[in-house]
Amino acid sequence: MSLLIIPKEEKKKEEPSEVLIDTSTAEKPEDVAREFIACYLVGYDIIRLRFRQRATEYRAYIKDIIRRKLVGVETIEESATHMATHCLLGHVEFPVKDALTRMHVLAQSMHKDAMMALKNGDFSLAKDVAQRDDEVDRLYFFVIRQLKMAVQNRFMIEEIGLLTSRDCLGYRLIAKSIERIADHAARIGQVTPTLKYPIIDNIIVSISEMSNTSIRVCQEAMKSVYQLNIKQANQAIAKTSKVTKLEKETIEQILLAKLNVRTVIGLRLILESIRRTAEYGADIAEIAINLAKKGKFS
């Protein structure tokens, strides 16, 4: 076994990294967007684009992606055939743990509002919840970018708020789980307007109980991450069985209520999303246990 010591003074201020995307081989704007996001995630500071055809269409699409999906990216140059962007927000200003906390708060708020929209038949609120998913995606991409850069540059580990490089995979999985929780909240928002109201009160009450339990799983899971608390993580995981039990009971209520087919299908999708939310919370709790053990090992 060997020990590698990296002196602090070796750290040097690096020049911004650049990459050029030539759009001439792209068949559609989505192809360019995927390449642009890949460059962002890898950690390039300046991303340049060269347009040869359909420049106006491609430029508008990339600007929309930047606005909706990416944190800290600004356009610094623009012409008829070229465009350059710079990622201005650094890891020191917005550490990974802060970004994860913000993601969790947004995802939890989306879920609660989606349930309120379901309860009240508020289609406007349901639509708003679905649209908020972009904000969670923006933070998710930012976290992945920071973690990828930290793996490549060990000087960044402490700067982004982590202890060791071994934490990077765990936090990446946590970010993905939170992003999926937000996706399921958005799906509830999308499904709600397809339901036929009124819906029997006892069904709404049962769905709400299942939702509240699911949210508690996620809350306790995130607390276990922040505190590296194995006992709390196990408590969160244990609660998922109650969510599964409530789902089965609520499905029975729905089938007995003789609702129209479209509403039955929609409610089943909503129940599935609530259950999946709890399962992603349990995944986060399991990662918290791993991080706690790694912390003791290191």
Regions found by a protein language model. Give the residues of each.
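Cytosolic, long alpha-helical scaffolding segments
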Residues: 1-298
